[in-house]
Amino acid sequence: MIALLLALPVLADDQVHLWILPEPEEFEVDRSILSVDEIHRANSFSRERDARRFSVCRSVLRDLLAGYVSVVANDLEFGKTATGKSSLTGLDEPWKKLSFNEAHCDGMVLFAFAQTEVGVDVERIQWLPDMGEIVTLYATQSEIRCLLELQRPSRASVFFRSWTMREVYAKRTGKGLAAFETAKEIAGIWSAAVRRISPFDRFDFQDEASVHRFFDCSPRSEYAVALCTATEVESFISFEVKRFVRTTEAAWR
């Protein structure tokens, strides 16, 4: 087998690359680049569709990472950070600080890459009958008032966008659900911005440890997508994975 490395766009220190995999089920599965543990995890799914989706996502992730760090996909070794996030091990400069994160929702999968810690989340925007009850469990009073004053379509959009802001903060910091108490303040800032109905594609938030930068980067109107990273990041660039990335044809656009 010939090992192929993607020629990917350069990942600058002040950028996040956001890769969109719109329909994983339509992609080929190449288990030859998966580890024994990954194959075991794929085989543990009770539904073939779930096993196939997992295999495709891991294969695409490996190929994208291989393209960035110039290491054959089969040879990549994964580990965990101090906060339990997935990471690559054994890398030399300048890739020692490469961070990546993954998010899934229905038929969309996202991969985010940056030279600093990064979190990504995606949620489908839809109306939930119990949305009002859910909000009272985690939102601030000002956010609840903001949501209740909005019309039904706008309320659903703000609800899921504020939720993704919480999620990406938790994912970037590695704190999980423990971060949601602090994240109340984040969502409050975001909700206030949405309420003003003005362009608001990013904002910064300082917690007890550092300053975090948030981006709203929804690729489609029916999805809410957010990124959380460091303040040295000035922008994100999105790409769509067109086909299984180990082919010799262009795999991005």
Regions found by a protein language model. Give the residues of each.
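Core catalytic alpha/beta fold that binds nucleotide/phospho-ligands
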Residues: 1-253
